Amino acid sequence: PQDDVAEPAAVMSPGFDVSSWVDAIVPGTVFASYVAAGLEEDPNFGDNIARVDRAKYDRSFWYRAEFAVPQDFDKEYVWLNFNGVNRKADIYLNGKLLGTLDGFMHRGRFNVTDVVTRDGMNVLAVLVHIPQTPLANYGSPTYLCSGGWDWMPYVPGLNSGITDKVYLSNTGRVTLVDPWIRTSLPSRARAELSVALDVRNNSPEKVRAVVTGTITPGNVVFSQEVELDGNAMRTLRFDKRYFPQLCINNPRLWWPNGYGEPNLYSCRFEVKVDDTVSQSQEVTFGIRQYSYDKNDNTFHIYINGVPVFVKGANWGMPEYMLRCRGEEYDLKVDLHRRMNFNMIRNWLGVTTDEEFYEACDRHGIMVWDDFWINSNPNLPYDIHVFNFNVVEKIKRLRNHPCIAVWCGDNESNPQPPLEGWMAENIRTFDGGDRYFQANSHADGLTGSGMWKAFDPRYYFLEYPDGLEGDPARGWGFRTEIGTAVMPNYDSFIKFMPRENWWPRDEMWNFHYFGPSAANADHVQYDALLTKGFGAPDGIEEYCRKAQLLNIQTNKAMYEGWLDHMWDDASGIMIWMGQSSYPSMVWQTYDYYYDLTGAYWGAKSACEPLHIFWNPVTDAVKVANTTARDFSGLQAEVKVYNLDGKEVPAYTRRVRFDSPSNTAVECMTIPFAREREIISLGKPTYASSSEYSSPADATDGKSDTRWSSRVADNEWLYVDLGSKQPVGGVRLNWEASYGKAYKIQVSDDARTWNEVYKTYEGREGVKEILFPEVDARYVRMFGIERGWWYGYSLWNFDVLGGSPVAEELSDTHFIRLRLTDSEGNLLSENFYW
């Protein structure tokens, strides 16, 4: 700690005694280094991290290293490079202050030629300063969730440290700065490349240099001579006007997962002075072109002219203490590819490592890339430092083909002037090649959430509602929706003390199954698990049954969106795809890479060619989220009772074609669907009545109606007499319809639970189905009238639960198979 160093100058002296210091992990954080040294109990386990003395780490720390310059450094200039610190650092070499890095995207490239000694030891000392609090958004740019969120704990030290690579490099007099390769596609048969880079003369003398780029595959070579004054920098540009070889015929395009191969190119840049290489760099890129629209107020993404139906997931921290490094990113991203995802949202931009983007490039995973602003209506302490880091991020990452969207703010718009600055930065330093979406859940998006488990039918109905978003609700493009996800038993016991296994107690809350993750609603998760699979008698049974719920819920989320593909659904990303901390919420694979039921549910639903069942309408559809048409496919349905015997009355087979980017209905399973009207003649009450009685809406007649006074917040409810299964309502609106209204249920007519809401009511008959719920009272609650009179209903019919045919057991199974014209299996699915 800085406080423990009485003489900072001594730290910078050779031979300084560091025997009492802690070995630092670089890249890494201060707290992670202390944990690795065994000076703190395992923070993954129990409530250990909550018992750490925060004051011990919430302060500035010194890093120190001694090094020798490599003997093979035979060029004139030696550079000391920093790729990232959190949050701020003062860099000293051999007692000389080289500079200060401010913000975790701020790169440091220090010319230390005249500071280092090449024939002895050098002392590097770095004073790392903790982020300012509160982090959101005052402390930004930083890892905002380091102060704790509803899925990860407060990390002592707020993940301060040297968080990215530190290395020496050796060059000649002339160096290259931030090469930038842009690609455009007049057609998919022809690509046009443009290249820009800065060339810097680091010496005081005028120099003549030659810059060459070589693109592979294809061995495309381009070159230009440049003359530079002493200590000058110049921008070079290469494009088809003077370098026709940058027009590439039949290019190998970069495609997202499911739409084609994620082909990559590399360009090796060299700058030579006097025919000697002064510096070389290699840049990996992909030939692709993104485009976008917001037709019908819904955000759509296209790549290479093809619409992409987005199936993806959010990432929070890659690991809550920044211990995910190198090849581990490849594992994480590959698991997303194996789930058939095509996008990851880098939530709040808290994944900063180059290896993440490289893995997404390789695996064909697009990135929705946030900046570091949460919905709090405040600005960072230093908006100019923030803006500098925005530019740094764009320059560092713009060559990655995986980046599809830049996003300004999580669940709001950046406060002025940041939104305008971000937009201009993207136009200037990314050429407008990627879209800037200022708000993560509005302006063409359908809100955030919900984040808890529901009956599968919920996701197919007109009520997969999100918070905020655009008034025209629907499926649309949803950047966050999720559920609690209990891990498998073998993972659970790795982080939970034995005495807290069962029954559940407060220790579970430390791992986010309780009030600490209220949005995950552990109570509803429990209720669905018990109702669907029976009450568990211990932790092993609970974990086992939870996997069935995890499969069922996560599969239904994606299938609900696929069921409305392009009408109006265009994309869905669950909250979240991976786990940064051992928890029981919002994950597909867990912290230990064990695959939960959520993984298998998502993997099934997101396969490129997928057969699925709508549990509300009983329609069977095939979703084709590829760039390829399929013909002569066969869909097959079989239904089995609990005894394993097939019920032949429901067997169906049909042949059909599946065009690219469609969801085609191929058949309907003939389950009984006529629901009983259970409200006829039942007592009915209203907030007001004009020229009619509330009972006129439940008398079964088509020529009598209830009407309210002229006001918005009016209601009508029916008393069914006792609790019974309710599965929907059928409204017949007169010309004075409800434009926005809710359907609510209650056991006591005092506390009401919402089961449906719409902002798009219309005159006429509207049948609304929702997951069955036991209730005595059912209410229509008006929010906004569609006409200048009050609300008026010819009929308010309450519908009972789904009927079950006599030949079917209460629990029965549906098996779906999709084969090609030669009988090869393409997709298989199941339900119970």
Can you name each region flagged by the protein language model?
Residues 117-121, 196-294:
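Extended acidic/polar, glycine-enriched regions
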Residues 197-202, 506-680, 800-832:
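Carbohydrate-binding surfaces of carbohydrate-active enzymes
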Residues 1-81, 140-164, 171-172, 295, ...:
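Extended carbohydrate-recognition surfaces in non-catalytic/accessory domains of CAZymes
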Residues 2-3, 32-33, 37, 53, ...:
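Accessory beta-strand-rich segments of carbohydrate-active enzymes
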Residues 674-682, 688-693, 698-803:
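Aromatic, loop-rich ligand-recognition surfaces of beta-strand-rich domains
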Residues 343-517, 545, 549, 553, ...:
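Substrate-binding/catalytic cleft of secreted carbohydrate-active enzymes
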Residues 32-69, 73-82, 86-93, 99-102, ...:
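Active-site-adjacent substrate/metal-binding segments within catalytic domains
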Residues 63-65, 106-110, 232-238, 662-667, ...:
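Short strand-edge motifs at loop-to-beta-strand transitions and within beta-strands
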